[in-house]
Amino acid sequence: CHAFYGFYTNPKKSQLTAVLTSDGGGDGVYNTVNIFKKGKFISINRSNKNWIGKIYSNTTLILGMNPFRHVYKVMGLAPYTQKTNYQKILNFFLNSLKVDKLDFKINSKIKDKYFYFKKNLEGYRFDNIAGALQNFTEIRLKEWFENVSKKFKVKNFVFTGGVANNVKANKFLSEQKF
């Protein structure tokens, strides 16, 4: 559903287009990679391994906010810190989830998506957590988009799903040269 909605509202439908979705996995699917080429919509990958949305919502909950309504507040807190203040937290997030070609690889130490993050984020300032989380999101999304761009030689992207509501990440992605 996310992929088709995003594609059909795309003003560049005639171009080779990668349609990527990323969300919290409410339907059991956390991400998809789709290609629209010469009038055909081709599903390339569907996975439950892209935990960016789940990590973001769980971290929002850990920070004492509603994960269904306040993720934008965490995104809004991110600019109020400096990378030197959150580098250790960023490394923790980066080690929890890696990009693996068109998919993602979850750290095998993670057994519970909530308590693993709660335990490891304990004692850190909320703004530093927010800054690290936002930076992590942008880094992993960029890697994913780059891999899709290289594999399919595509420059036109449509990005939908809950993670795509992160306007800071969208701005960051729109500034990249894929």
Annotate each PLM feature.
Residues 1-178:
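Short acidic/glycine-rich loops and adjacent helix/strand connectors
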